[in-house]
Amino acid sequence: RLEAADRVSRGLPAAGQAVVMTKWMGLEGTAILAQEKEAQLLARFPRVMVEKAKGFEKYLSILPEAATAGKSGVSFMQAVREGGIFASLWELAERAGVGLHIDLMKIPMDQTVVEICNYYDLNPYEILSSGSALLFAKQGQQLCEELAAIGIPAAVIGQTTDGNDRIIQNGEEIRYLDLPKPDQIRKILNYSAKMANKGE
């Protein structure tokens, strides 16, 4: 493990850097559900919501984020992928050798993602989230503004810390990130039979 001064001198993040997240969690997982379970979802939700979920596919590239990161003093960047935002936060902290303090309420979400995940009893924080990126930066708000200027919503969701703890805070409640779990989307592969109880 690198000491804080070594991380700075080698261009790696020290404690106190902003953790920035782009777009919204659960984009790809929700798009897949909307495409593969369209008829079922239309029986429960308005067509406009299902079409919106299918349209999340257009957000899956993170090339613009990468281009901005390269000129904005970003020390680390990672695509949010399988296992969702929780898995990617863990993996990025491991790569960077830092702890994390994340405010759960600041993680960007879309209500469509939440409602579709709730329908299938899936955790939206642990579902395939390609299209979103995590970045460590000294000037988090400035990075968010630079991303907004090219049409990419972003938010500071926490900061890096010394030590190994990966803390998720939800109001006064504190929890610690677990090791990454299998992606929630995998549940759907064996879920169809159970959905009979929901009127499939």
Predicted feature residues:
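Active-site-proximal betaalpha loop/short-helix elements
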Residues: 53-129
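Helix N-cap motif at beta-to-alpha junctions
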Residues: 136-142
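Solvent-exposed alpha-helices and their adjacent loops that cap or buttress functional pockets
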Residues: 10-14, 32, 67-71, 94, ...
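Glycine-rich anion-binding loops of enzyme active sites
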Residues: 1-36, 159
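Active-site glycine-rich loop that binds ribose-phosphate moieties when present
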Residues: 1-12, 48-67
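Acidic, Ser/Thr/Pro-rich beta/coil linker or hinge segments at domain junctions
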Residues: 150-200
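Short, compositionally biased
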Residues: 31-48
